[in-house]
Amino acid sequence: MTALMIQGAGSNVGKSMLVAGLCRAARRRGLTVAPFKPQNMSNNAAVTADGGEIGRAQALQALACGLEPVTDMNPILLKPESDVGAQVVVQGKRLTTTRARVYATLKPQLMGAVLESFNRLKATHDLVIVEGAGSPAEVNLRAGDIANMGFARAADVPVVLVGDIDRGGVIAQIVGTQAVLDPADAEMISGFLINKFRGDVTLFDDGYRLIGARTGWRGFGTLPWFPLAHKLPAEDALDIASGPATGGTVIACLTLSRIANFDDLDPLAAEPGVRMVMVQPGQPIPAEARLVILPGSKSTRGDLAFLREQGWDIDLAAHVRRGGHVLGICGGYQMLGRSVADPEGIEGPAGTTPGLGLLDVETVMTPDKRLTRVRATHAGSGLAVEGYEIHIGRTEGADRARPFAIVEGQNEGAMSADGRVIGSYLHGLFGADAFRAAFLRGLGIRASGQSHAAGVEAALDALADHLETHLDVTGILALAR
């Protein structure tokens, strides 16, 4: 038993959650198991203990394995900065920023780093469960591929193909994938499974048998929709919006065009007394919102312009006049100030963009990136806060004399004179249960008193139980070689 790979017949078929569940199931069998994703594209990154960054999904999968996340679990991370360009992070460290066409020429060189990381994990664990990216059916991207079949063949890892029945056409998804694949790539697929079924699973029995007959592949089962999916940290901002939509006090978060590291929202969204609303482009900020969150952004000045295009600057000013609260985290903190200057053109064309003016601070972008885990003390309550920083730029100004937190004896963040507008560089701050409860009380919201970490662990166990009930998990794990 060495490794197996989960690939999708399309994007967003549930690969990340399936890998997390399989990792927990394998761990409960007494195996040492590690997750691995050769290439991920996401602005929702996790900071590793060794000071690197990987996709947030792989950090959750590491938790399912009982491991600390390390950069080898996601050696290539692409962080989009525009519609055509992305930052390339290799084994946790920024390599370059490039356009898609240029990146295609880099991929063959990056396969070495991918295999190096994979082999390190393979040498120290009984099992490595690999997650593909997108779909191998995108055969126009096959040349130089390091994320799907290119990796599977280079590392000789068997593949299970996942189809998403919720979006319809799952027979065509799976049979069609086999039809367009190069025969040598198709031979890497050992079986298939169906994900996200709603209703009576037996109604798909004929379709399930048809897929097996057409492809010759072994079926590993049909998995019903996992009802506790919203209890797990979200990989996509839209996943947060898919949680319970009724009841609770409204906390609104702006869905910026380059939203990043929005895992700050997960502990809040899990609170029964909170209704998290992701404000979509073109929508007004809800007037009933008790708190408005400006999240992290991969392009602060670009998202400031985007925010104004939606009219959210006007909504925010009205929200503050009504006595509402505002929290800006990382890029959102930078936006709250009087200006954001980028004299070297690090995030785009050089220049200065006026901020929202809700905090008396100014930010200057600098080339050096701060990437570290943080233990802090909340300045207002004295409660412990843990999180991480992942940003460029320095923020200074009068409101920093009223800090959000104290980090190693230094002021962190800023607060307005009336205490209703707060900015901080600390991501993950609401994972601290006592602080989260105190913060919510300050908004007039009763906290559940539950441990967020314990809730995530329970959801991972429930996910593994769900897979064990409906899939041939033993058969899937037995494919590893």
UniProtKB/Swiss-Prot annotation:
Q: Which residues form the GATase cobBQ-type domain?
A: 248-435
Q: Which domain of life is it from?
A: Bacteria
Q: What does this protein do?
A: Catalyzes amidations at positions B, D, E, and G on adenosylcobyrinic A,C-diamide. NH(2) groups are provided by glutamine, and one molecule of ATP is hydrogenolyzed for each amidation.
Alphabetical list of Pfam families matching this protein = CbiA, GATase_3
- Active site feature: 330, 427
Q: Which GO terms describe its molecular function?
A: ABC-type vitamin B12 transporter activity; catalytic activity
- Family membership noted in the UniProt record: Belongs to the CobB/CobQ family. CobQ subfamily.
* Pathway(s) annotated for this protein in UniProt: Cofactor biosynthesis; adenosylcobalamin biosynthesis
Q: Report the record's Gene Ontology biological process terms.
A: cobalamin biosynthetic process
> Aminoacyl-tRNA synthetase as a keyword?
no
Keyword Aminoacyl-tRNA synthetase listed? The answer is no
Supply the alphabetized keyword list: Cobalamin biosynthesis, Glutamine amidotransferase
Protein name in the entry: Cobyric acid synthase
